[in-house]
Amino acid sequence: MNTSAKRALIPLGIFLALAALLFYGLQLDPRKIPSPLVDKPAPEFSLPDLKDPNQTLTRDILIGQVSLVNVWASWCPSCRQEHAELMRIAREHGVRVIGFNWKDTRPEALAMLQRYGDPYTVSLYDPDNKAGIDWGVYGAPETFIVDAEGIIRHKRVGPIDAQVWAEEIQPIVARYQGGKP
């Protein structure tokens, strides 16, 4: 094969390599994006309480028991989809669920909780994504499992339903609560 024929194959080889990478990337599950925060202390924050703007909440609320920190917004259809499951988890499993209201307005967020119920022990209010950036939030819903020492143990991107709870979230929560998954 002469030199000009070899040169002509270079763009084809590059194209095939890029196509293979694209095909591989399309097969990955976007919900399984690893978080650099897993197994590290939850980021510091100082945010107002959604219901009581005069109360400031800090990372200290995460210390003492295992928590699900659920990033949500009233404008998020998937958040409304998972809301009933979060209510069930809080009621039936006694898991502390902390809301992280993200890029929302206070009136709309409060209206959603009034309409659908409030599964949250407390809700952080982050309308400007000040803390969301530190937590690596890029969409809602997202849920973090934080152990009693304030260490992030798992991040879930996307809504939680009964199957996700039973197969993914609950076993991790049980492990850090001292039970067996």
From Swiss-Prot:
One example GO MF annotation: disulfide oxidoreductase activity
Sequence ranges on the Cytoplasmic membrane side: 1-6
Location(s), subcellular: Cell inner membrane
Keyword Transmembrane among record annotations: yes
UniProtKB keywords: Cell inner membrane, Cell membrane, Cytochrome c-type biogenesis, Disulfide bond, Membrane, Redox-active center, Transmembrane, Transmembrane helix
Gene3D superfamilies named among the record's database cross-references: Glutaredoxin
PROSITE patterns: THIOREDOXIN_1, THIOREDOXIN_2
Any one GO cellular component localisation term in the record: outer membrane-bounded periplasmic space
Keyword Cell inner membrane assigned: yes
Transmembrane segments: 7-26
Membrane topology: Single-pass membrane protein
Disulphide bridges, residue numbers: C76-C79
Occurrences of domain Thioredoxin (ranges): 36-178
GO BP field: cytochrome complex assembly
Periplasmic side: 27-181
Pfam families listed in its UniProt record: Redoxin
NCBIfam families linked to this entry: dsbE (TIGR00385)
Functional note: Involved in disulfide bond formation. Catalyzes a late, reductive step in the assembly of periplasmic c-type cytochromes, probably the reduction of disulfide bonds of the apocytochrome c to allow covalent linkage with the heme. Possible subunit of a heme lyase.
Similarity field: Belongs to the thioredoxin family. DsbE subfamily.
Protein name: Thiol:disulfide interchange protein DsbE
